[in-house]
Amino acid sequence: MMKKSATTSSACNGCPAHSGNKLRRMGTDAERYDFTIALAGNPNTGKSTVFNALTGLKQHTGNWPGKTVEKAEGAFSYAGSSYKIVDLPGTYSLLSTSEDEEIARDFILFGKPDVTLIVADATRLERNMNLILQILEITDRAVLCANLMDEAERNGVEIDLRGLSRRLGIPVVGASARSGEGISDLLSALSEVAQGIYRCTPHRLTSIGTEIDTRIDSLAESIRLFHPDTPNSRWLALRLTEGDRRVENILYADNEAPAEKLKKEVDEFRRNFGEDLHDQLSEALYSDAGKICQEVITQANKRGRTPLDIKIDRIVTSRKWGFPIMLLMLALVLWITIVGSNYPSQWLSDSLVGILHPLLKTRATGFLPDWLSGFLIDGVYLATAWVVSVMLPPMAIFFPLFTLLEDFGFLPRVAFNLDELFRRSGAHGKQALTMTMGFGCNAAAIINTRIIDSQRERLIAILTNNFSLCNGRWPTQILLATIFLTPAVPAYLRGVIGIGSVVAIALLGIAFMFFFSWVLSRTLLRGQVSTFNLELPPYRPPQFWQTIYKSIVDRTLVVLWRAVVFAAPAGALIWLTCNIQIGGVGIAEYLIDLLDGPGWLMGLNGVILLAYVLAIPANEIVIPTILMLTVLTTGIDGGTGAGVMFEADGTAETARLFEAGGWTMLTGINLMLFCLLHNPCSTTLFNIYKETGSRKWTLLAALIPLATGFVVTVAVAFVWRLVGG
């Protein structure tokens, strides 16, 4: 039970008026609503958990900063009124100009929500207070949810919520959103503020100085005079004095007298009180935050963390053990993924390719023309079936494991360990987080680069993320390591060599990411490395089954659907290139002959290069395409027709086909390298263009890894042939 000083519970909370049965979760049905709620707060405070508890949606939550990178909307109804709730990106401040901070600030300021629900971490309220006070400078209608009250109690933190409410001038509710405790009180507070029953008198900065405060009020009055429809003129006045470009663009939209008068007032303010008010404003915020927290927080554990957390971090983030543990965890996740996905992948392949494909062909005979049957069943269907059978089982294992590590709190420690390396390479420390996301899916990681404040450093993260070996490329690496590397060692070492070689490829990708971040930061994207706060969240036991469900639904199936959308037309294209002939020779054979020259230079062949061209929509269909093209060019037994992708019966049969195609150990090793170092898939390229809005940066993101792959494979092939004769 929570201590009385750390909860808002009262004797009446059990009555119907305060029970949660008035809540009706409406998911995304927000077309008609009476009130709008902005959901704001620091990263990793449980905002998304509160959002899910109110709306019934399943937005992904994780135990690390930066999970929400854009606005998510949901709806609920309570006590006869309907509400739209907008989950804003988590941010530590509203005073700078990163994308997530601008989204949050602009919605609270210009979106005019009826209530701003601020979610704070009760175990670290003093760290959250800075943002709370900034939000209260913007809006007059807010509710504070002190979340994670159960953890606060375990850590010996007691909060006088009534005293905090008096000091802030807004309702304050204690809650534990994961268990649903306090949600009914939160709903009641939101309803009262939205309907005007509770009149907020929000805290205003008191440590900024009387003279500055008077001048700010005078400038705010001028803004109200010239722009009467603009919300919160005081906050806009503060931002004008700091030179906020977006606010200047809004208020200086014309060059007429009002704009000139405002500019003169701002210039006079800066002459009297300095060019930069930022330091003084920050000092005032920290001063007020410190005074408030000192009054309302009693903390038995002054460090705010359990001794066990501290002991674990001394090992996990140490210089001696941090990297070995990180590599061990990566190897363990890979091993579980590899071993666990073998049988499900085989079962799906047997079902979708071995049973359903021939059945569809039989049913189509006499019903569809041969060319249409081949196009739809051998092309579109078979490519889609391959993507599902090869991609679904590893993702269904990898993503839940990845998410469990998120929820436990391990991934921020990985970012902490890698931060210094990224800083030295001229990149932002948060790139460590997007790099880790890239191991699951590069396309998703590109979107999550929004957590990086600096546009320059965000571009570096986008341009180099493809060096993270994504989930779609793991099966190819594993197959090649099994066929070409493990047979050269004793049987008892084969598992270690197989896993070790794949981990080595992944580490090589990280090394290239550091290298190109360093190059870009000193050439095309010069600039100073930004500083940032990386908060190490407490270790939390994951909600196991809920995490499994969410990771499969929100990640695995979403990524799989995107891959299928691109794989289906790719299958059609592959079938067409193999079956359309010119002068009695298929287009595919012409292209293979054309690519054999550069393929030989790279230690590969024309079949492999054409497979990568045709399989650009999805990395998962590279190996089936290679096998199909190998059968087409060699004329050996295998497959069921031109342009029909298939899988050999086991690695031994696959090895036989590779050998028939003229493959050597050099081919296998260089294909492992090229699998890492080639252009992003079409889904990732689409996301890059969407995030950058630039064809130039999208093209560069494709050329950097592709050119690197060409140079590396040519160099390896040259040395190999030189040494081997």
From Swiss-Prot:
Keywords: Cell inner membrane, Cell membrane, GTP-binding, Manganese, Membrane, Nucleotide-binding, Transmembrane, Transmembrane helix, Transport. CDD domains: FeoB. The keyword 4Fe-4S does not apply. It is found in: Cell inner membrane. One of its GO terms (molecular function) is GTP binding. Belongs to the TRAFAC class TrmE-Era-EngA-EngB-Septin-like GTPase superfamily. FeoB GTPase (TC 9.A.8) family. Disruption phenotype: A 3-fold increase in intracellular manganese levels. Residues 34-196 form the FeoB-type G domain. Not involved in Fe(2+) uptake but is involved in manganese uptake. Could be GTP-driven. The chain crosses the membrane at residues 321-341, 385-405, 473-493, 496-516, 556-576, 628-648, 657-677, 699-719. The lineage of its organism: Bacteria, Pseudomonadati, Bacteroidota, Bacteroidia, Bacteroidales. NCBIfam families: feoB. It is a multi-pass membrane protein. GTP 3 binds at D87, L88, P89, G90. This is Fe(2+) transporter FeoB homolog. GO terms for cellular component: plasma membrane. Gene3D superfamilies: 1.10.287.1770, P-loop containing nucleotide triphosphate hydrolases (3.40.50.300). GTP 2 binds at G66, K67, T68, V69, E70. The gene is feoB2. PANTHER family: FERROUS IRON TRANSPORT PROTEIN B. GTP 1 binds at G41, N42, P43, N44, T45, G46, K47, S48.
